[in-house]
């Protein structure tokens, strides 16, 4: 398909991810802090809970991809899930930020149940959404444009959520922070629902895939045999691990290192503005140079900047604002490229084995993304607990301070170095090879269409 997508459809598609990021970024930045400092749950338990919830995702994510690939409706395969999953998703978001008056054990059980439900419903909405991008168009240029719009709006959605959350908490709850968090997420959940509805009504599934007749086991085997899908899966874990560890530590960093929790909103806003610029730069830069080269060079630059941040003196506020802006630009520059690379692996899989597994491929990607999110949350929780973090203390011990600085700077740097090395050495779907693959797939589709049109028709049918 070479149809040029309208700006309205690109915005509509981007609104779907803006809605997801309203919740996803909020959970990534605030949920650890909410559980430890508002709900009063031990940091070590929260870290373990985040990680164990991923065990369920190992089953739910591929199942959702399998179901989406086999869905047949007048709205397509993927769009119905976006609309009909939106309301329960919003309700569970509010429940996850609710603080019932329970014993410590009761609180831990409540948090585990609501957090697990939240991740399940995120799966129901987001796996079909991610797969939708693979069936709107198969034109490489249009895909980059679509994903650039997606991540500009996704960044705006995440910025809307994370920057407005604390003002909403203070406005709605005042001194009652627990009620403020509940009210704040309720407002944002309504906004997310409206965005998902807009996505549903403005997008169209153009690439028609024949009904799947294979089992989930066979589909899982096929995507695992796709070596380029495995490479992008590893890159996805590293990417989200870097942003999750830094994002989840940001509140602690502003409070205990920069010495002013009030600076958090401005600090986060600076990062998000950088994100917006990075998303907008993805399309022109990939028009100029191969997206794979842009990807690994940018990850290398992120590693260098992250290490440099480690040496910034405590309370050097202005310098840190400059660094976090650069990090925001560079990180969000590679994110849309990474999602296009995942779409390319679906084309590569179809080219190698004749099966287009869009839904389950993106289900696997979302699983590794959430695995990275869980590993990041677990790492923060375990390391803070190991360092003796005390939410009620006026000052933290030196071990905790060192851990917070390391999590905010060096841990992401390691992820970015590994991403650069892996992308440069092992990812092979560069522009010339991908053009060849798409050309051969298009020839095969035309040949199949011609064979269908030239099938002999019996006399009975003619009469």
Model-derived features: where do they sit?
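Membrane-embedded alpha-helical bundles of multi-pass transporters/translocases
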Residues: 2-463
């Amino acid at each position: 398909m070479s149809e040029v997508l309208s700006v309205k459809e690109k915005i509509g598609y981007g609104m779907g991810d803006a809605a997801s990021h309203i919740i996803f970024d909020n959970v990534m930045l605030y949920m650890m802090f909410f559980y430890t400092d508002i709900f009063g749950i031990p940091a070590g338990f929260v870290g373990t809970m985040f990680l164990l919830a991923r065990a369920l995702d190992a089953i739910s994510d591929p199942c959702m991809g399998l179901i989406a690939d086999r869905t047949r409706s007048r709205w397509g395969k993927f769009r119905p899930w976006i609309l009909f999953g939106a309301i329960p998703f919003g309700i569970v978001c509010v429940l996850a930020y609710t603080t019932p008056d329970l014993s410590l054990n009761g609180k831990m059980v409540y948090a585990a149940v609501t957090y697990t439900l939240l991740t399940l419903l995120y799966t129901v909405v987001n796996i079909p959404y991610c797969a939708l991008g693979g069936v709107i168009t198969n034109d490489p240029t249009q895909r980059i444009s679509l994903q650039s719009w997606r991540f500009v709006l996704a960044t705006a959605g995440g910025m809307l959520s994370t920057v407005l959350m604390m003002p909403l908490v203070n406005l709605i709850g005042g001194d009652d922070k627990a009620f403020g968090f509940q009210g704040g997420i309720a407002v944002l959940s309504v906004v997310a629902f409206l965005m998902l509805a807009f996505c549903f009504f403005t997008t169209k599934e153009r690439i028609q895939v024949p009904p799947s007749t294979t089992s989930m086991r066979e589909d899982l085997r096929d995507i695992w045999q796709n070596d380029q899908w495995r490479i992008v899966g590893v890159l996805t874990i590293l990417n989200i691990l870097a942003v999750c560890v830094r994002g989840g530590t940001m509140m602690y960093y502003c409070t205990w290192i920069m010495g002013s929790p009030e600076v958090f909103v401005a600090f986060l806003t600076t990062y998000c503005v950088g994100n917006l610029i990075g998303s907008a730069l993805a399309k022109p830069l990939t028009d100029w140079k191969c997206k794979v080269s842009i990807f690994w060079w940018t990850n290398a630059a992120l590693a260098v900047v992250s290490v440099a941040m480690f040496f910034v003196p405590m309370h050097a506020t202005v310098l840190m604002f400059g660094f976090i802006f650069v990090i925001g630009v560079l990180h969000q520059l590679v994110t849309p490229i990474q999602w296009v690379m995942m779409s390319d692996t679906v084309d590569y899989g179809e080219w190698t084995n004749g099966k287009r597994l869009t839904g389950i491929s993106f289900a696997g990607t979302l699983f590794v993304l959430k695995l990275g999110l869980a590993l990041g949350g677990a790492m923060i929780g375990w390391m803070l607990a190991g360092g003796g973090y005390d939410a009620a203390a006026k000052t933290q011990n030196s071990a905790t301070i060192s851990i917070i600085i390391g999590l905010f700077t060096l841990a992401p740097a390691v992820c970015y170095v590994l991403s650069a090395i892996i992308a440069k050495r092992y990812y092979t779907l560069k522009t010339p090879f991908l053009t060849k693959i798409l050309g051969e797939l298009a020839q095969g589709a035309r040949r199949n269409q011609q064979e269908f049109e030239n099938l002999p028709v019996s006399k009975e049918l003619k009469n």
